[in-house]
Amino acid sequence: MANLLKRWVESDKRELKRLGKIADKVESYADEFGALSDDELKAKTEEFKKRYQDGESLDDLLPEAFAVCREGAKRVLGLYPYHVQIIGGIVLHEGNIAEMKTGEGKTLTATMPVYLNAISGKGVHVVTVNEYLSERDATEMGELYTWLGLTVGLNLADKSPEEKRNAYNCDITYSTNSELGFDYLRDNMVVYKEDMVQRPLNFVIVDEVDSILIDEARTPLIISGQATGTTTLYTRTDRFAKTLTEDEDFKIDLESKTVSLTEDGIRKGEKYFGLKNLYDPDNMALNHHLDNALRANYIMLRDKDYVVRDGEVLIVDQFTGRIMDGRRYSDGLHQAIEAKEHVEIEEETKTMANITYQNFFRMYNKLSGMTGTAKTEREEFREIYNMEVVSIPTNKPIARVDKPDLLYPTLKSKFNAVVRDVKARHEKGQPVLVGTVAVETSELLSKMLDDEGIPHSVLNAKNHAREAEIVMNAGQRGAVTIATNMAGRGTDIKLGPGVRELGGLAVIGTERHESRRIDNQLRGRSGRQGDPGVTQFYLSLEDDLMLRFGSERIKNFLERMKVSDDDAVIQSKMISRQVESAQKRVEGNNYDTRKQVLQYDDVMRAQREVIYAQRQQVIMEEKSLKPIIMPMIERTVKHTVLMHTQGDKSEWNLQGILDFAVSAMVNEDTISLGDLVNKTPDEIVDYLMKRAEDIYAEKEKQLYDESQMLEFEKVVILRVVDSLWTDHIDEMDQLRQSIGLRGYGQLNPLVEYQQDGFRMFEQMVGAIEYDVTRLFLKAEIRQDIKR
């Protein structure tokens, strides 16, 4: 381990040395560009564009372009990027991750690579975690870009397609990650190319990159339509689940968050639902509902995983503690929770298009990101995204003190200690930020502080709008702020007058998060830009992380210490180490899950790319789709003839071919068995293809102008592809649910999924070609066709 660390430190040093040289080159232009007039400086943008068009690379232009942007920032924003910020900018331009501590000016750092890459005219996307930050940065940094002669667009969820298109056509576009993904999916569902909003994905800088590419990597973006589901099954399975007793009828595995029925539970189920065998393949739907009912009742906790508000079940984001409006658990889990909470059960929805953030962002030509904490996930960034994490040195040394964890026997004693600590600091005027993992913890603490008469602000999932404002004031003298993990992320906490002398901002963590990175983010709220500060985590044996992974060693350790008093406290390096190792285990589990999700999703990705490329080809076609449609018809005809002419001639099924021709190609009264007898299979194919050519020519006559014929061809293909592709997505989802069960038969589930998925894809392509043949050849032409 020590060797590995040494290698990292060495490679970091070498890398920083290389980057430092380029940064020196940028700084060498400072005097020359500083002497230019405003107009001369602005004219540089056009000069760079021309040089780029004439074949100079962005790497060649980097030193001058960065220097121009830097001088521009000084004149427009009154900010002048430091040496370390230039280094960060180069890292971003090279498609890697710049790890910069809180308050080191990530937003300003990004201006240089954004400016340089916008010169190519291919578009630069800057991604933030919420719309508030998108608007803020687009407005503030937008002043600089427009001054330098570039256009800036802001892409928000409520904008019209027209406004979105304009935003994407700008040199620089600010957006949230989800909106970019949804626009991509919607673009691949449109039927007219004029309705598309995005340009090809070129360069993206992701702010808080760990949050989006790692914490949310598994979150699929789903566009769905209504499907016909059965709500009665949800209520029945929910009623049954509520009759069961833990340990006797079912077992809970907290580590993997699963519930499984015991033999007794299975027998009860068979009796309750009147079945011989609960796990018979015919009862697949029932089992799926039953699994969900068990999870909803015994794993998903109200006010921790979700809240119920106005008769609606709303998901709480486990990483940020925010309510995720409009998001629903998929695969029927949401409906199961609705049944559990006795609120109205919404119909299940059918997925029309989906993609994960991992695969969406991997489609960019160049992907880069910034964050305060990425070191712990170095491996994952390298393996999955092929990005290096470079730690950028701080501009001033860090003066914050991180104290070892304090461990208490019970939750109650822990919270009492937290309140005592807050009270003592508040009395001398030191500002305190208390970080909590769950919404209910922040509410409990708030109540305890009220009882002590300590004024404070609470930031949690339920209070989006005032977040930034509260965070900005969290560093004022006497301020006490309680916040769930990531609330107000991206907004700096600046220290008010007189606070430095009191020791700066005190950050108190009320429990460790399962990810070290989130703990580090909380610590990083204090001690920005060399400010003083202190951080302290309080733990108890009853914390989630301890219950799930706290080893026997800690419990024995406490018994040996004869800790009986509730307020007894231990501050020990061993405890901190145990917690770290528990966190590493969880992180390992989470990484494995994400990697596995990606391997499965890669199967879908390959298929999605094929289908989307075909759709693009169809939508973009301007003359005729005959070169696409005729081969489809030919493959369908060949396949059908081959199927019916196996073996000896006496065994051929010519009637089958005739039935196909009548149902998919020609009118009944224009063909008979006599037309097929005494022909070889090849001759039958030729005969049917000749008929198809005739029908094609006939249709061209009916649709007197080319554009109408093209429109008709597009309607046919898009209708068929879209309908079969959405069915296929659903089937692949179901395959994935069931594939895990095959692991028992010594088969590798991933390989099985790849093989079955490929076979299903082939079948879908065959079905698309058959449906296109039938729709195209048999459709009655009316003059007014609409896609």
From Swiss-Prot:
Physiological role: Part of the Sec protein translocase complex. Interacts with the SecYEG preprotein conducting channel. Has a central role in coupling the hydrolysis of ATP to the transfer of proteins into and across the cell membrane, serving as an ATP-driven molecular motor driving the stepwise translocation of polypeptide chains across the membrane.
PANTHER family, A to Z: CHLOROPLAST PROTEIN-TRANSPORTING ATPASE, SECA INNER MEMBRANE COMPONENT OF SEC PROTEIN SECRETION SYSTEM
SUPFAM superfamilies named in the record: Helical scaffold and wing domains of SecA, P-loop containing nucleoside triphosphate hydrolases, Pre-protein crosslinking domain of SecA
Family: Belongs to the SecA family.
Positions bound to ATP: 85, 103-107, 492
Protein name per its UniProtKB record: Protein translocase subunit SecA
Principal location listed in the UniProt entry: membrane
Organism (species): Ligilactobacillus salivarius (strain UCC118)
EC number: 7.4.2.8
Entry's Gene Ontology BP terms: intracellular protein transmembrane transport; protein import; protein targeting; protein transport by the Sec complex
Transmembrane spans: none
Gene3D superfamilies: Helical scaffold and wing domains of SecA, P-loop containing nucleotide triphosphate hydrolases, SecA, preprotein cross-linking domain
A single GO molecular function term of this UniProt record: protein-exporting ATPase activity
Subunit and interaction comment: Monomer and homodimer. Part of the essential Sec protein translocation apparatus which comprises SecA, SecYEG and auxiliary proteins SecDF. Other proteins may also be involved.
Database matches in InterPro entries: Helicase_ATP-bd (IPR014001), Helicase_C-like (IPR001650), P-loop_NTPase (IPR027417), SecA (IPR000185), SecA_CS (IPR020937), SecA_DEAD (IPR011115), SecA_motor_DEAD (IPR014018), SecA_preprotein_X-link_dom (IPR011130)
Keyword field: ATP-binding, Cell membrane, Cytoplasm, Membrane, Nucleotide-binding, Protein transport, Translocase, Translocation, Transport
EC top class, as a word: translocase
Subcellular location per the Swiss-Prot or TrEMBL entry: Cell membrane; Cytoplasm
Its membrane topology: Peripheral membrane protein
Annotated Gene Ontology cellular component terms: cell envelope Sec protein transport complex; cytosol; plasma membrane
Keyword Protein biosynthesis: no
Source domain of life: Bacteria
Catalytic activity: ATP + H2O + cellular proteinSide 1 = ADP + phosphate + cellular proteinSide 2
